[in-house]
Amino acid sequence: MASENMTPQDYIGHHLNNLQLDLRTFSLVDPQNPPATFWTINIDSMFFSVVLGLLFLVLFRSVAKKATSGVPGKFQTAIELVIGFVNGSVKDMYHGKSKLIAPLALTIFVWVFLMNLMDLLPIDLLPYIAEHVLGLPALRVVPSADVNVTLSMALGVFILILFYSIKMKGIGGFTKELTLQPFNHWAFIPVNLILEGVSLLSKPVSLGLRLFGNMYAGELIFILIAGLLPWWSQWILNVPWAIFHILIITLQAFIFMVLTIVYLSMASEEH
């Protein structure tokens, strides 16, 4: 455990606290006494999300600038494989015409993968540095284990769904889709509106909560192993779970990307 003075419950609770900023006073929030207000943001989630997004841009830009027509290096080959895989997925699932979808899918896949990958760092490494070197009261390093991050990304996808629906069908067509399906009669407009509204709103909610739930559970298992077992025996469970978690990390990034493509493809269909 990170501290001999902590009980397992204290240790687990400490690692589930975000570093928060109170926007009313622009001061850090005490995790032991959080204010009952909406005006707080998880600045650790924002920081790592932005840093990992910039890392993605820098890595891919550097590879693009150094790309050659000859024999590529190992890193360039890996990047090209990822790009080819994402591009193939877009061609298979998106049947409209848009230059935005493939770059969007690539960004989502790599960005979510990098955020998920933070879960494989030693559970106490960055929080220990933050507490003892920087004097921060709390730190969580997995942005995708924060429901605010995953729902914010899902909200961005939802806005694109609305944009493509209105762009391809027009305001009138989009309105008819909400009010005259599945029952094509004016008397069923209220029922149709409820059914289609729930169906539409469930897309971003399920998209965000699915990623959050899987990553939060994975993070919690690492914390439980570190908090409840002696340090010399943690590797017995940590190593197998970390190996299995690599699959979860990749799969969740892939699922988020695929559902985004599918939802945008459905929105782009002309009726």
Swiss-Prot record:
Main location: membrane
Membrane-spanning segments: 40-60, 100-120, 146-166, 220-240, 242-262
Topology, Periplasmic side: 1-39, 121-145, 241
Outcome, altering R210 to K/I/V/E: Completely defective
Cytoplasmic-side positions: 61-99, 167-219, 263-271
Keywords of this entry: ATP synthesis, Cell inner membrane, Cell membrane, CF(0), Hydrogen ion transport, Ion transport, Membrane, Transmembrane, Transmembrane helix, Transport
Documented effect of changing L207 to Y/F: No change in activity
Record localization: Cell inner membrane
InterPro entries: ATP_syn_F0_a_bact/chloroplast, ATP_synth_F0_asu, ATP_synth_F0_asu_AS, F0_ATP_A_sf
Gene Ontology terms: biological process: proton motive force-driven plasma membrane ATP synthesis
Domain of life (superkingdom): Bacteria
SUPFAM superfamilies listed in its UniProt record: F1F0 ATP synthase subunit A
Listed GO MF terms: proton-transporting ATP synthase activity, rotational mechanism
Membrane topology qualifier: Multi-pass membrane protein
Subunit field text: F-type ATPases have 2 components, CF(1) - the catalytic core - and CF(0) - the membrane proton channel. CF(1) has five subunits: alpha(3), beta(3), gamma(1), delta(1), epsilon(1). CF(0) has three main subunits: a(1), b(2) and c(9-12). The alpha and beta chains form an alternating ring which encloses part of the gamma chain. CF(1) is attached to CF(0) by a central stalk formed by the gamma and epsilon chains, while a peripheral stalk is formed by the delta and b chains.
NCBIfam families in the record: ATP_synt_6_or_A, PRK05815.1-1
Role this protein plays: Key component of the proton channel; it plays a direct role in the translocation of protons across the membrane.
HAMAP family assigned to the protein according to its UniProt record, in alphabetical order: ATP_synth_a_bact (MF_01393)
Protein's name in the database: ATP synthase subunit a
Gene: atpB
